[in-house]
From Swiss-Prot:
GO molecular function: rRNA binding; structural constituent of ribosome; tRNA binding
The keyword RNA-binding appears for this protein: yes
InterPro entries: Ribosomal_uL16, Ribosomal_uL16_bact-type, Ribosomal_uL16_CS, Ribosomal_uL16_dom, Ribosomal_uL16_sf
Coiled-coil ranges (or none): none
Subunit structure: Part of the 50S ribosomal subunit.
Superkingdom in the source lineage: Bacteria
Alphabetical GO biological process terms: translation
Protein name: Large ribosomal subunit protein uL16
């Protein structure tokens, strides 16, 4: 499972998810990727399920990069416990994902294979996603340089 080896603070506040992703919103390594279109917490189990779905579909070919990491602990109190008496214990880890964030990148496979693999992975995730290619970002980058 994905989780940090060591953390400065064992418990953190929930925080707010507002705005768009300012970092990690372009393809860095692969040719194809899935991009988040809404915000959510994605757990380490969901990331692992999506990774397995992609790897099973592409089999031996291609290389996969996971661009998100669950570094936020989520605490839960035991069932049937009265309110108060402190914050619960950390139960699982989540990655905070904002719209525009690249979740997975893939290369070394045909576009149709990548599209289907990413579709299978997106069914394992709790958010809406869209399939993007490196060409999409090059076109956008080319237009902004000229204008």
């Amino acid at each position: 499972m994905l989780m940090p080896k060591k953390v400065k603070h064992r418990k953190v506040q929930r925080g707010r998810m507002k705005g768009k992703a300012t970092r990690g919103n372009s393809i860095a390594y692969g040719d194809y990727a899935i991009q988040a279109t809404e915000c959510a917490w994605i757990t380490n189990n969901q990331i692992e399920s999506a990774r397995i779905a992609i790897n099973r579909y592409i089999r031996r070919g291609g290389k996969l990069w996971i661009k998100i990491f669950p570094d936020k602990p989520v605490t839960e109190k035991p069932a049937e416990t009265r309110m108060g008496s402190g914050k619960g214990s950390p139960e699982y880890w989540v990655a905070v994902v904002k719209p525009g964030r690249i979740l997975f990148e893939l290369s070394g496979v045909p576009e149709e294979t990548a599209r289907e693999a990413m579709r299978l992975a997106s069914h394992k995730l709790p958010i809406k996603t869209k399939f993007v290619t490196k060409r999409d970002f090059e076109e956008v980058g080319g237009e902004s340089d000229e204008g």
